């Protein structure tokens, strides 16, 4: 199975960002990390193995773009002013929209995009998908926190 690591300096964020690409074809799946997780956690947790998502990746049904985050600089940056945290989240959204989506389309022309995440990644998947319905066809949120201010769990 194809595994590739990519890193570039993000103009939207003003810093280097990393991601991991798994698979060779299929629906493009944006995989958001859990709370303070990383781009490698889905492979670290063997989600790409047979019996989990391995067959889907091997058969070209999905291609996963495992993303990194800016949690400490946004919602988890409790030392920051709330407005600064919200602004950083919007910059992350711009990074996804203006950099990750075009990058993934350059790797794989399949127009079908799925945003998926677990825990705080589910919040990011839902947020990005709902904010960009013209770019995202499906959202899968697993055990996510959807109301950060009220800390309500769904």
Which functions belong to the PLM regions below?
Residues 1-153:
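Non-catalytic cap/lid and distal C-terminal segments of serine-dependent acyl enzymes
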């Amino acid at each position: 199975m194809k595994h590739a690591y990519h890193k570039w300096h993000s103009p939207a964020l003003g810093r280097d960002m990393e991601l991991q690409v798994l698979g060779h074809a299929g629906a493009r799946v944006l995989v958001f990390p859990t709370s303070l997780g990383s781009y490698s956690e889905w492979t670290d947790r063997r989600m790409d193995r047979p019996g989990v998502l391995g067959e889907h990746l091997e058969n070209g049904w999905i291609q996963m773009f495992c993303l990194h985050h800016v949690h400490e600089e946004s919602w988890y940056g409790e030392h920051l002013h709330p407005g600064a945290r919200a602004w950083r989240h919007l910059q992350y959204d711009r990074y996804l929209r203006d950099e990750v989506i075009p990058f993934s389309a350059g790797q794989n022309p399949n127009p079908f995009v799925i945003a998926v995440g677990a825990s705080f990644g589910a919040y990011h998947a839902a947020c990005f998908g709902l904010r960009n319905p013209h770019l995202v066809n499906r959202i899968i949120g697993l055990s996510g926190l959807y109301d950060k201010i009220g800390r309500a769990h769904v």
